[in-house]
Amino acid sequence: MIMNMKNIFYCLLPGLLLGACSNKVYEKTGDSVIVKVQHKETGGPRLVRLQVMGDKLIHVSATADSKFADPQSLIVVPQKKQTSFAVVQNGDTITVSTEEVKASVLASTGEVWFTDKNGELILQENKGGGKTFTPIEVEGTKGYTVCQVFESPEDEAFYGLGQHQADEFNYKGKNEELFQYNTKVSVPFVVSNKNYGILLDSYSFCRFGNPNDYSQLNRIFKLYDKTGQEGALTGTYVPKKGETLVRREDSIYFENLKTIENLPKKLPLMGAKVTYEGEIEPAQTGEFKFILYYAGYVKVYLNNEPVVPERWRTAWNPNSYKFAAHLEAGKRVPLKIEWQPDGGQSYCGLRALTPVNPEEQGKQSWWSEMTKQLDYYFMAGENMDDVISGYRSLTGKSPVMPKWAMGFWQSREKYNTQEEMLGALKGFRDRKIPLDNIVLDWNHWPENAWGSHEFDKARFPDPKAMVDSIHAMHARMMISVWPKFYVTTEHFKEFDENGWMYQQSVKDSLKDWVGPGYHYGFYDAYDPDARKLFWKQMYEHYYPLGIDAWWMDASEPNVRDCTDLEYRKALCGPTALGSSTEFFNAYALMNAEAIYDGQRGVDNNKRVFLLTRSGFAGLQRYSTATWSGDIGTRWEDMKAQISAGLNFAMSGIPYWTMDIGGFCVENRYVAGQKQWNATKTENADYKEWRELNTRWYQFGAFVPLYRAHGQYPFREIWEIAPEGHPAYQSVVYYTKLRYNMMPYIYSLAGMTWFDDYTIMRPLVMDFTADAEVNDIGDQFMFGPSFMVSPVYRYGDRSREIYFPQAEGWYDFYSGKFQAGGERKVIEAPYERIPLYVRAGAIIPFGDDIQYTDEKPAEHIRLYIYQGADGEFTLYEDEGVNYNYEQGMYAMIPMKYDEATKTLVIGERQGEFPGMLKERTFTVVTVNKEKAQPFDLNAKGVTVKYNGSEQTLKL
């Protein structure tokens, strides 16, 4: 039940400020202040509460009821009660003050605003209160559809919200629907360039920006077909064989299994070509925002201009793309959609939102379909890192990942036999290509036994020996585990007899795509006992084999592809906590809790690693990374992963990855691979496939987790290109470089725990004062030192780069200096990605290794990029256990002073079992006068280090 808010963009309380209240209108209770709203309007709050969570953290609650419901938060961990704050009433304004921030409530409306300790405004709710409550009842449970709006200055920018696929970076003035789906991970948290964050504590379907649903075209436009007749567009359906069908279409809405029934009944979509064309006439002037939903190939033309160049997505996992157009009231504009469906079942839709006043569109607006009360957390910071630190203090710290997780991961859909998997690993070792992890995807079980956690003995005759062999080759193994169970398995029955299995798919006799199709269900991860059973079954079947990591697939949960929203809710509910309308988005968080708590409960000395296809606020506390799902193998998909990964990082969850090369493969690439296999000739498509993978690997080497995966063609580099090919050479170069960088990378992993650091960083995090970076979503920092600029267009051998305002930058490959505050077109040959190092960087590089724990880093090359002061802390621990939580780790602080050209390698702090007592540093300097390329054999100043402070004049 989605609230109908016709033509309302922001949630405006119409009440006027009716004067000051002379009486005390608040109640202080421990760590909170409750304000009774004096002039409640229909749909407004009756109570507003400010709860102090820390000097920079304020929890705001509001309710339209006479008391707060206070449901248990799924995302906020238990907090120490804060009582050190002051409360002052001045007229009808009640102000709560900590040492760092002030939060005020206007008792006449419930409006809240936040300032720093000096009274400078940080954030203000929409004038008049900005909060509305509309009653909703689902499955006998009452709640509210809520909306919260904040004022926003013109120069503000917003980041976060999880990771989405529309290739949007700065969400200022944008709209995003927050729900979980394959390739779409929603996190209700944003960070502002004004150095604050807002976390909405809601688990239902939400919207950021315009709270209205996109409308069918005929509801906001007059439609004209290609002959000029009013009332519809013209739909022309040309099958591969047979007669062309032409009919009038009053909407383009074929977006799910239900609505594609409205396509022409006798039209075979396979090989068809479809055109929707005519004219649209708006009733008002302004910017209309469109959303295109597509599977197959699609193009969109508006006013005879291409507004959506060709895009593609596989039929079973459609994608959305957004665009905007300024249209004038009463003026007819040509519209044309060209669609080539993918397969016999495919999807296409185009909907739109009517214009909104730009000032209102630019505000920060949140809408939640169902919640008991409004709850959000305000966190202020000195910078964006400080804001994210506040987020993690609320939702949980991010543990140090196992060191091997920072190496290279090889995966494919899928290794069908034990021999295939071991053969792939042996291929890396024989070719001396570094690797730490190999992955076994779904379908390693007997065909009719999904969820049994058993191996198909014909294909995997000895799983324990397989895992042992992987370990003997100094690699780790991750295995795919789903929350899905065939109804015939004992595991399903064990859940079902306790009432812990979602029933709708069973009642509807849904079958999956395997073999003849099998009946199945998903377990309810919201039930704590069900979570314990989920881990117990994994522990009994998988854990004794020595498996190192867990791949939580379909954790949205994606019970069935391509269903409408209401049926999706039916398939994943009711939950143990309530209706799936209220608890729609947090499944992956609950599922991750099952594995993390389960493994730490049985083996607290082995670091947990989870990779999940979905996520939610707080996911980081369960040692869980997210990958961006089953994305397409297209250049536009590769580009979209840059902004997706950056916004996911800004959502407070530091570990993210993607399928390098994309998952779903266009048929032309498959045909190119088969031609190569048969004839060793490279056609145009296969040439592009190789370049696409090369550019994607170059990008992937600089994200938190470096991982290749996808459907056929196989993704091992020697399957993509032979050893002498530039694609092969480039991928091997960056894989080896990743391992040379391991002292740097693992130190970043340590910083995520100790300093709440973010590894993959949009430029705005480090250069907030430089307004030029606010909208740059295709460059990023990898840690404090490297600026990465992926190449994402076929055939490009250069790209424009903005160099943020800093003391300077150095080309990593040549060592040449580049000034900051400039835009330049930089060469990007096939084999190289533009990579620059910030002046002041101190970067530790290790020797060539084949896996992360091959040997201790006895010799480290310290590259000092002069031109600015710099510092870095080398972090080390045992790499595989939780002893660091007990203080068993070592840090070596390093500082460079530009004025004196002095490097101080500080006294080592801490120790751990197996720690190197002594090592050698070779210090290599790079400066404007000496363009020193990166070279492991470069000469420098050698220092013997035994843990005592060393000072070097450079």
Swiss-Prot record:
Q: Where in the cell is it found?
A: Cell inner membrane
Quote the InterPro entries the UniProt record gives: DUF5110, Gal_mutarotase_sf_dom, Glyco_hydro_31_C, Glyco_hydro_31_N_dom, Glyco_hydro_31_TIM, Glyco_hydro_b, Glycoside_hydrolase_SF, Glycosyl_Hydrolase_31
Q: Where is the signal peptide?
A: 1-20
The terms describing its cellular component in GO are: plasma membrane
The entry summarizes the disruption phenotype as follows:
Severely reduced growth on tamarind xyloglucan and completely abolished growth on XyG oligosaccharides.
Q: What is its EC number?
A: 3.2.1.177
Q: Which reaction does it catalyse?
A: Hydrolysis of terminal, non-reducing alpha-D-xylose residues with release of alpha-D-xylose
Per the record, pH dependence is: Optimum pH is 6.0-7.0.
Q: Which UniProt keywords apply?
A: Carbohydrate metabolism, Cell inner membrane, Cell membrane, Glycosidase, Hydrolase, Lipoprotein, Membrane, Palmitate, Polysaccharide degradation, Signal
Question: What other facts are recorded?
Answer: Gut bacteria supply the human body with energy from dietary polysaccharides through glycosidases that are absent in the human genome. Xyloglucans are a ubiquitous family of highly branched plant cell wall polysaccharides present in the vegetables we consume. Enzymes involved in xyloglucan degradation mediate the conversion of otherwise indigestible plant polysaccharides to short-chain fatty acids.
Q: What is this protein called?
A: Alpha-xylosidase BoGH31A
Classification lineage:
Bacteria, Pseudomonadati, Bacteroidota, Bacteroidia, Bacteroidales
